[in-house]
Amino acid sequence: KNCFLFRKSFMKKIAIIGAGISGLFAANLFSKNSDYQVMIYEKNNSIELDEGYGIQLSTNSIKLLNNIGFNKLEDIDQFNPEQIDFYDLKNQKKICELNISKFNTENCKYTALKRSKLVKFLKNRLDNQVIKYGHNIQKIEKKDDQVVLSFKENSEKVVCDILIISDGI
């Protein structure tokens, strides 16, 4: 006897508005699963990768980032401070200190790094076709079980099953 098992599978289309850190992170998470097709719509014509300023990442955020390979980032690109000192801005006197190393584990350490390093890491893990630049959202409509996106720049309409808005506003 022949027996065939057919899995009825529908790839869910995910649209992400905004190619900042949160949008890029979400795209990385969903891209790991073949049940999802991910597309990021960014209003700017590129992602700013200037050296810029530093950011601090808690151990909880490092744990999430490690799910997409952050732990493979070179040590030279990051710093793991042991404590944070708090100062009064008016008189510049130290108010207190926080020993953050006690929150660290072997694989999840409080981390400081340049924002551009994190953005490059997140962007470089995605296929080039995942980010559509120059797409400024004009209208979002719900139609049955889907979402329809319209853009200011053209008459293109995008239909998706899941919409993630992470435009920083």
Label the model's feature ranges.
Residues 11-22:
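Beta1/beta-strand and adjacent pyrophosphate-binding region of the FAD-binding site
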Residues 14, 31, 58-169:
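Conserved N-terminal helical subregion
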Residues 18, 42, 165:
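Short beta-strand/turn micro-motifs composed of small residues
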Residues 25:
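Conserved SAM/SAH-binding loop-helix junction
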Residues 31-51:
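Glycine-rich FAD pyrophosphate-binding loop
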